[in-house]
Swiss-Prot record:
Gene: TEF-1
Start and end residues of each stretch annotated as G4: 153-156
Keyword Translocase: no
Family membership: Belongs to the TRAFAC class translation factor GTPase superfamily. Classic translation factor GTPase family. EF-Tu/EF-1A subfamily.
Keywords in alphabetical order: Cytoplasm, Elongation factor, GTP-binding, Methylation, Nucleotide-binding, Protein biosynthesis
Sequence positions bearing N6,N6-dimethyllysine: K3, K316
Residues that bind GTP: 14-21, 91-95, 153-156
Cellular compartments annotated: Cytoplasm
Domain tr-type G stretches: 5-240
Modified residues (N6-methyllysine): K3, K30, K316, K390
Residue positions where N,N,N-trimethylglycine is found in the record: G2
PANTHER family linked to this entry: TRANSLATION FACTOR
Protein name stated in the entry: Elongation factor 1-alpha
């Protein structure tokens, strides 16, 4: 068996017709968690419906339809393996809610796979000024995705043309460079997601193709196929090295034990004996024990849903939406105000200063006022369009100063990603999403329990 493989999350980006469903379907199908029985069932259905030619995309459509109907699909279906990694596809291609999912999604993508259709006209449509591709790639970059793989798909439709491949590399390099990626660190792979060329095995149809290479801080790497390129992703730095952030989902009072906050560790580590601070409640106390699934844990790591017992704190002191942190290592604080880049998705009117919708950020659900619209920016290029706009409407992106109506704890996205992205809810729908750029933190004296004071003296 050997060592457990490292997990990486990829997000697949590309125009609706770039063939990303087929390509993703192919990888999941060939290297993934779909068992033989399910595949045979899907293939039979596809053939009966005369969709034989779409079998990979069809597999994906089936999965997607089931997911959207709320049938919980075995999440293994969205996974595949490379020699080095367990890969999870965190946003399935072609999703209407791509932007919302990317920003409010639970996981952070480690790498983007940009799928470009090589066919004449198709490539141009995908990358045109209003192109979705551009926007999704910029969004991935804004959300901290720094590794990218470009798969140039449907090479069969260009008769496997080297000239077309090089032409596209040139265009795409310029395009991703504008966003902020370094083309030298990006593998460009010519593929056919449908026929399987250069997906897992080297293609015999493109003898001119000598392979891809990339240079990153981790050194130079080269390979032939898309699978090679995914296997060559630089291993992500995991958030266990960061200071602790654990947003509370609930706080229970358990007879004979006391107060037990519950939540998911987003960054850092929590263990018994630690002195923790809850923000914005501003209460500091000692952790007596940590458990998961009713078993004692030595430590809770990022991704773990834990319950932990705290001394001398009543259920009234802390609540859902509070954030637990290490009192000695960048403790969490209340946010007096913060600036964020907000993308308006669907709002029927105009949004101006004074608008005060509810923000969902980690487990907090609190109204925040749009105090000032600082600038309007171009969603596709990230460039400033105007200073201090009066209003923003659907489709606009703006830098906004926001003030919470009640004490709230949030962080800059670059410091603690899960606490730095939010959804704006109004009229029972998500009207906008945002990424926090900077937070003005409030310093004030808080309550330190006897247990914490004692533990601090040790």
């Amino acid at each position: 068996m050997g060592k457990e493989k490292t997990h990486v999350n990829v997000v697949v980006i590309g125009h609706v017709d770039s063939g990303k469903s087929t390509t993703t379907g192919h990888l999941i199908y060939k290297c993934g968690g779909i068992d033989k029985r399910t595949i045979e069932k899907f293939e039979k259905e596809a053939a009966e419906l005369g969709k034989g030619s779409f079998k990979y995309a069809w597999v994906l459509d089936k999965l997607k339809a089931e997911r959207e109907r709320g049938i919980t699909i075995d999440i293994a279906l969205w996974k595949f393996e490379t020699p080095k990694y367990h890969v999870t596809v965190i946003d399935a291609p072609g999703h209407r809610d791509f932007i919302k999912n990317m920003i409010t999604g639970t996981s952070q993508a480690d790498c983007g796979i940009l799928i470009i259709a090589a066919g004449t006209g198709e490539f141009e449509a995908g990358i045109s000024k209003d192109g979705q591709t551009r926007e999704h790639a910029l969004l991935a970059f804004t959300l901290g995705v720094r590794q990218l793989i470009v798969a140039i798909n449907k090479m069969d439709s260009t008769k496997w043309s080297e000239q077309r491949f090089n032409e596209i590399i040139k265009e795409v390099s310029g395009f991703i460079k504008k966003i902020g990626f370094n083309p030298k660190s990006v593998p460009f792979v010519p593929i056919s997601g449908w026929h399987g060329d250069n997906m897992l095995e080297e293609s015999t149809n493109m003898p001119w193709y000598k392979g891809w290479n990339k240079e990153t801080k981790a050194g130079a790497k080269s390979g032939k196929t898309l699978l090679d390129a995914i296997d060559a992703i630089d291993p992500p730095q995991r958030p266990s090295d960061k200071p602790l952030r654990l947003p509370l989902q609930d706080v229970y009072k358990i007879g004979g034990i006391g107060t037990v906050p519950v939540g998911r560790v987003e960054t850092g580590v929590i263990k018994a004996g630690m002195v923790v601070t809850f923000a914005p409640a501003n209460v500091t106390t000692e952790v007596k024990s940590v458990e998961m699934h009713h078993e004692q844990l030595v430590e809770g790591l990022p991704g773990d849903n834990v319950g932990f017992n705290v001394k001398n704190v009543s259920v009234k002191d802390i609540r859902r939406g509070n954030v637990c942190s290490d009192s000695k290592n960048d403790p969490a604080k209340e946010a007096g105000s913060f600036t964020a880049q907000v993308i308006v998705l669907n709002h029927p009117g105009q949004i101006g200063a004074g608008y005060a919708p509810v923000l969902d950020c980690h487990t907090a659900h609190i109204a925040c006022k749009f105090a000032e619209l600082l600038e309007k920016i171009d969603r596709r290029s990230g460039k400033k369009l105007e200073d201090a706009p009066k209003f923003v409407k659907s489709g606009d992106s703006a830098i906004v100063k926001m003030i919470p109506s009640k004490p709230m704890c949030v962080e800059a996205y670059t410091d603690y990603p899960p606490l730095g992205r939010f959804a704006v809810r109004d009229m029972r729908q998500t009207v906008a999403v945002g990424v926090i750029k900077a937070v003005e933190k409030v310093d004030k004296a808080g309550k330190v329990t006897k247990a914490a004071a004692k533990a601090g003296e040790k």
